[in-house]
Amino acid sequence: MLVGKQAPVFKATAVVNGEIVNDFSLQDYVDKKYVVFFFYPKDFTFVCPTELLGFQAALPEFTKRDTVVVGCSTDTEYSHWAWCQKPQCEGGISGVTYPLVADTNKTIADAFDVLAGERYVDENGKLQVKGELVAYRGLFLIDKQGIVRHQLVNDMPLGRSIDEAIRIVDALQHFEQYGEVCPLGWHPGQEAMQATHEGVAKYLSNNSERRMQNN
């Protein structure tokens, strides 16, 4: 669990707006931007392009919230680049402009604790691998101080909700600005609450009808 801790620091090669760049680091955003950092299993697969293209379509919403989006998988930068060149009608992700990090040595996925597969040393002292060392669908919201404030990890068949990622950014920023905590399903413009007995009592009283409708 990384929530409440400093996000792991790394430097890696990435593809940014169709160009290969060296020494990419999330540290460059500290004190400047919020970061939605997400992992996906593989380039040229099936659920993954729906997520990557979905994040691209929602990029203006993240930008309005002073938030950058960064993707990462264990593929090479050349695989990322080739996938970015391939038309969407052929399963590609042409049009994706945000950074795609190449975690070829698996250390970033391992540091964020989303690396699938098992590694162990056998009785002969040799490193063995069971399963494929690719990333689960992890997503991390990192604040401007570089602290992980939210994490979500899905198994590989389960795509994520970009609307929920945006909602979590909104909730964090509301808390930072107003000091109010954000209850179940909160969206901007809805009532939040003070983290006190009086605050929760007021919230529950004001929203009892809405809870009944949701049930």
Annotate each predicted stretch with a short phrase.
Residues 1-215:
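Chalcogenol-based redox active-site neighborhoods
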